[in-house]
Amino acid sequence: MEKRLERAMFAGGCFWCMVQPFDKQPGIESVVSGYAGGTVENPTYEQVKTGTTGHYEVVHITYVPELFPFEKLLSLYWPQIDPTDPDGQFHDRGPQYRTAIFYENEEQRALAERSREALEKSGKFKKPIVTSILPMATFYPAEEEHQQFYKKNPMAYKEDREKSGRDEFIYKHWGK
């Protein structure tokens, strides 16, 4: 029997930092860095980093919902980001670094909206939650050097992550 696969996309700032939390989770088949939501077909990193293409840096996740439900993806996603920042994430600034959840179907949309509302009501953040919830957009895989960056370049990844302020923020707000 063939397993049923679903897709999800999450924008959470630099895609380098968004792969590792989802990678190697049981039920997640693939995590691919790339671009979505913009106006340029087959964009390159050089184009997207200008902030003029409308694309988000995203991770595209293929998963088995019976083994790793969408709610679990959401519970991994929120603690990776600052959902109150409309202008980027941590030291990465610009529209390509905004946060968003891209849904594939109405069930995902409803779950994403409920989880955003629950986070808003939790009082965890003083500012409003600005993470967008958007319909699935065309996904363009990023160049090979951006795939699995944390594995290919562990020292550069660690240094970038430390400098970004992401881990301090996560610890302060999520205790992880």
Curated annotation (Swiss-Prot):
Positions of the catalytic residues: 14
The UniProt record lists the EC number as 1.8.4.11
Asked if the Swiss-Prot or TrEMBL record annotates the protein with the keyword Thylakoid, the reply is no
Q: Which organism is it from?
A: Halalkalibacterium halodurans (strain ATCC BAA-125 / DSM 18197 / FERM 7344 / JCM 9153 / C-125) (Bacillus halodurans)
This molecule's function is given as:
Has an important function as a repair enzyme for proteins that have been inactivated by oxidation. Catalyzes the reversible oxidation-reduction of methionine sulfoxide in proteins to methionine.
**UniProt-listed PANTHER family:** PEPTIDE METHIONINE SULFOXIDE REDUCTASE (PTHR43774), PEPTIDE METHIONINE SULFOXIDE REDUCTASE MSRA 2 (PTHR43774:SF1)
Source organism, top-level taxon = Bacteria
Does the keyword Oxidoreductase belong to this entry? yes
A molecular function (GO) held by this record is: L-methionine:thioredoxin-disulfide S-oxidoreductase activity
Catalytic activity annotation:
L-methionyl-[protein] + [thioredoxin]-disulfide + H2O = L-methionyl-(S)-S-oxide-[protein] + [thioredoxin]-dithiol; [thioredoxin]-disulfide + L-methionine + H2O = L-methionine (S)-S-oxide + [thioredoxin]-dithiol
Under the heading InterPro entries, the entry gives: Met_Sox_Rdtase_MsrA_dom, Met_Sox_Rdtase_MsrA_sf
| Name of the protein in its database record | Peptide methionine sulfoxide reductase MsrA
Family in the record: Belongs to the MsrA Met sulfoxide reductase family.
